[in-house]
Amino acid sequence: MRISRLLIRVLLGFVILFITYILFPSIPKALVNTLNVYKLEERLNYYNDRLLDGNLKSKELENATFVTLARNADLYDLIETINIYENRFNSKHNYPWVFLNDEPFTRTFEVVMSRLTSGPTYFGVVNSSEWDIPKWIDMDIAHSNWNRLSREGVLYGGMKSYRQMCRYFSGFFWRHPLLDPYKYYWRVEPSTKLLCEVNKDPFRQLRLLNKTYGFVITLFEIGQTVPSLWNSTLEFIEKYPETLAKNNLWEWISDDNGKKFSHCHFWSNFEIADLDFFRSDSYRKYFDFLDKKGGFFYERWGDAPVHSIALSLFLDRNKLHYFDEIGYSHAPLLHCPRKGRCFCKPEEIDLSSNSSCIARFINLTNEDYDEL
């Protein structure tokens, strides 16, 4: 048995060397070295064990995909992230991965990402009309506001590309043709990490639990970035009252009966959700209404508060799910569960206090969470 295992490893090693140095000699040597550092032995062991166990039959998958919006310069940060997601979850399932960029990906980026992922990979370019600043924005006013926010020390306060990204994730990512075939998506950003082994399929959990949207981290939005977002939302509700769900989560996003925004939101750099919510008539109307207000560029409206307000108003509160068992990190924040094979220090949540957004969410939804 040991001889068979050794032989398989040697053969796989030669295959990897052939692919790297013969088929793709243009990949920088430093990049090849970086790839070799990331658990080559672990990957060989994984595929070796599957071969020996005869366990190569594909498992039934949900109609789902990973989604990453990235630039070519994010390649090295993504190498670590993709390896972690593959080793701690996707190598057991082989879900596809959709990569989007506002410009064409390089051949090196596509080759490396395709080698790292266990499922199919697809690479797309964002439609320029959905990425560029719309014509109704007064750029003199916008630049003046950007400079002010930058002077005030607001994170990304003066950054144009950040605003473009927030607007794209608020109203357009789900319209990309590469996402048309799918029902569920899992958003992954460069430099993020899974801190635990993910033993349950989150896509399947959403379907079986009849949930629409899943998250791991909640926090308060920076008030300076969304001064008019709530009033714009109230205008929308007055115009389209039929969009409100009966058992919505109004109290989570406003603790004074709608006078002010609580600033609580789901941190959207990690979200696992049903794309049909964003495809819905209610959400489309809401985004189009906000887009005409110009707050993505005159202020710094993020996709996180936009998603969160829409989810809290247009969905039954029982459609929202806290993936408390999934450990996740996006510096400087992380979520570390109490249970599971994790590589972090577990956190405590005081459910007796409404000072945190997650405590308020749990108290309002009355769900039982094993980790708490």
UniProtKB/Swiss-Prot annotation:
Gene3D superfamilies linked: Spore Coat Polysaccharide Biosynthesis Protein SpsA, Chain A
UniProt keyword terms in alphabetical order: Endoplasmic reticulum, Glycosyltransferase, Membrane, Signal-anchor, Transferase, Transmembrane, Transmembrane helix
Annotated Gene Ontology cellular component terms: endoplasmic reticulum membrane; Golgi apparatus; Golgi membrane
DNA repair in keyword set: no
Subcellular location, record wording: Endoplasmic reticulum membrane
InterPro entries: Glyco_trans_15, Nucleotide-diphossugar_trans
Transmembrane helix keyword on record: yes
Its EC number(s): 2.4.1.-
Active site: E271
Enzyme kind, highest EC tier: transferase
Gene Ontology BP annotations: cell wall mannoprotein biosynthetic process; protein N-linked glycosylation; protein O-linked glycosylation
Signal sequence range: none
Domain of life: Eukaryota
Record topological domains on the Lumenal side: 28-372
Spans through the membrane: 7-27
Membrane topology: Single-pass type II membrane protein
GO terms assigned for molecular function: alpha-1,2-mannosyltransferase activity
Membrane topology, Cytoplasmic segments: 1-6
Family assignment from sequence similarity: Belongs to the glycosyltransferase 15 family.
Purpose of the protein: Probable mannosyltransferase involved in O-glycosylation of cell wall and secreted proteins.
Name this protein carries in UniProt: O-glycoside alpha-1,2-mannosyltransferase homolog 2
Annotated organism of origin: Schizosaccharomyces pombe (strain 972 / ATCC 24843) (Fission yeast)
Annotated gene: omh2
